[in-house]
Amino acid sequence: MAIRSIRKYGDELLRKKSRKVEKIDKRLLTLIDDMFETMYNADGVGLAAPQVGILKRLVVIDVGEGPVVLINPEILETSGKAVDVEGCLSIPERQGEVERPTYVKAKALNEKGEEIVIEAEDLFARAICHETDHLNGVLFVDKLAESEGN
């Protein structure tokens, strides 16, 4: 396992759309391990592959309920709304209020290639939305609440 360098705000790669993961192989499993180590080292709760320079649809999340791997995640359903403060490991100097759903149902593959369906609430739901945005080249600063201004 290795700590990878996190791309920072202004890096063009963070604005690109990630490609679907076609196969789960040793390289991808190593990337997953590295992403968890990088995220934990930076005291984060989520990390998307583009943040470490890889344009693949892969995110890792741990909001305190254990590590979760989402390969090719797809949000199926959302409900509720809440505005809360978010930060991002790629924009360490900034936080802001972002409106997100309070409930998310998503499907993805896990690291074994099995399809999983996750129902998440509150911080976990927020993390899934935030990290999935990264896969589409969207950063939390693009979604700041009206009161924050852009």
From Swiss-Prot:
- From the UniProt annotation, give the residues forming the signal peptide: none
**Pfam families from the entry?**
Pep_deformylase
Biological role stated in the UniProt entry = Removes the formyl group from the N-terminal Met of newly synthesized proteins. Requires at least a dipeptide for an efficient rate of reaction. N-terminal L-methionine is a prerequisite for activity but the enzyme has broad specificity at other positions.
- InterPro entries attached here? Peptide_deformylase (IPR023635), Peptide_deformylase_sf (IPR036821)
The entry sums up its family as follows: Belongs to the polypeptide deformylase family.
SUPFAM superfamilies the UniProt entry points to? Peptide deformylase (SSF56420)
| Catalytic residues in the record | 131
Binding-site residues for Fe cation, renumbered to this chain: 88, 130, 134
**One GO MF term:** metal ion binding
Record bears the keyword Transcription: no
Output this protein's name. Peptide deformylase 1
Entry superkingdom:
Bacteria
Instruction: Identify the Gene3D superfamilies for this entry.
Output: Peptide deformylase
For this protein, what is the EC number? 3.5.1.88
